[in-house]
Amino acid sequence: MLEIHALNQFYSGSHILRNVEFTVPDAQLTVLLGRNGVGKTTLLKCLMGVVPVKSGSIAWRGKTLTSAPSYARVSSGMAYVPQGREIFPRLSVEENLLIGAASRPSREAKRGVPDDIYELFPVLRDMKQRRGGDLSGGQQQQLAIGRALMSEPQLLILDEPTEGIQPSIIKDIGRTLRRLVDERGMTVLLVEQYYDFALELADHYRVMSRGAIVASGLGKDMEADGVRHMVAV
């Protein structure tokens, strides 16, 4: 379980995260929703150690990681797919994937890209020698997720993976995330603006507003709880 307790963060005097507190249960998919600018991306960066926290704590499976460097969090089983994908455009698809294996023992990384990555994302096998920058936005998103999975995480954190992506690939990504949870027991924290995508996938939901968690519950109750109205622009 991922546990976030009383997390606070400031930017240039502005209070961005305000006593953020929630859990992400093991082997389930939790969606974090909220309008633009409420602090969702900042929260994810704090979880991964990209941005330091001012106060509060972060624990993953009982181990406190609040002050741990990013590489230690990856080594503990966390992986992050950032907003905007951030692939390496001049490297091949295969090279991008292998970078994701950097935290694995060298003997494991030398084995190359596991078949299960290509099974989840067949297009990456077909294009493994093409440069990452030549892929479409949807293909790059699949590459970014595949790269994160190369570290063999137990917790996968994604920041708006449907942004700017065609509907057919959105469906593919949704099916893949559901498989990771249902078949592999992976824990997923998904920040998402596309409400219907979140509704379809969520086991649990959390809603952020003005830097704080203002609602939470089971995914099956999102409509009854009025979550659509809470996050409508």
Spans of model-derived segments:
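The feature captures the beta-strand-to-loop junction immediately N-terminal to the Walker
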Residues: L33-R35
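Helix-to-loop junction immediately C-terminal to a conserved catalytic motif
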Residues: M48
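Conserved ABC transporter NBD signature motif
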Residues: G56-T64, S76, A109-P114, A215
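ABC ATPase C-loop
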Residues: A148-L149
